[in-house]
């Protein structure tokens, strides 16, 4: 009873803190960035991390098993994973471009877990026989950590595409305006020189230098986080195969969840190939990662919505 009450309190505290953090970020977007508020938001995410950690530990204490047995627990663990990813640049003293992604992601997953699911789904229950294994912690935690990392990396790639697309549109309209407005020979020479600089430096110009630096950082962080998520996903799939052989007598059954996990792995393997290949631009790999964003949600929620297959124990449909 004490642990259940503690879990309830920590749930509301963590959700309240992260809501305030989101509000601070909106204030920073609407007005001038205040250093004190920025630092407060970072500390707020750290406090959220410890609250969710306490929540999961409390649930583990009174349930008797690692809290990854149903959809509610997996969503809370996913929110916890987002907070971990958020803190990595902070403690590394890097500019935290991830906060725009991790903060809304954490509040969305936790908000959906606490308010979007039926109350009955919040209750901890006895593990089904297939889940009564030491592989539960290894397999499911690796998969959820990979989802969090891959989602963050994919959203950074989406942001990269948006900035690149907007710049292409701006350049198109500026060129169209010059062509329709008439210009002298000197202006033609200037336009050709400017076009040459843009082509050779990939958006690097004096006017767009800040935007260029932003796209470089987005591409850098997207690649690093997706690489980490891909590693977690690989470990999760391999550990799941070993667990499946122990529980069902086969390493791979082409279950819907397994099939989509394989598709997810393939998509991000293609991303890593295009990203490390010098013949492809960063926008090409960003397109692949953006496709991966949708595929991850299908992999995570697809089976839960249908309630079929060997992984249906975490579905929306009560068993």
UniProtKB/Swiss-Prot annotation:
One of its GO terms (molecular function) is heme binding. It is a multi-pass membrane protein. GO terms for cellular component: chloroplast thylakoid membrane; plasma membrane. It comes from the Eukaryota. InterPro entries: Cyt_c_assembly (IPR002541), Cyt_c_biogenesis_CcsA (IPR017562), Cyt_c_biogenesis_CcsA/CcmC (IPR045062). It is found in: Plastid, Chloroplast thylakoid membrane. Pfam families: Cytochrom_C_asm (PF01578). Keywords: Chloroplast, Cytochrome c-type biogenesis, Membrane, Plastid, Thylakoid, Transmembrane, Transmembrane helix. Belongs to the CcmF/CycK/Ccl1/NrfE/CcsA family. PANTHER family: CYTOCHROME B_B6 PROTEIN-RELATED (PTHR30071:SF1), HEME EXPORTER PROTEIN C (PTHR30071). May interact with Ccs1. Required during biogenesis of c-type cytochromes (cytochrome c6 and cytochrome f) at the step of heme attachment. This is Cytochrome c biogenesis protein CcsA. It comes from Ceratophyllum demersum (Rigid hornwort). The lineage of its organism: Eukaryota, Viridiplantae, Streptophyta, Embryophyta, Tracheophyta. The gene is ccsA.
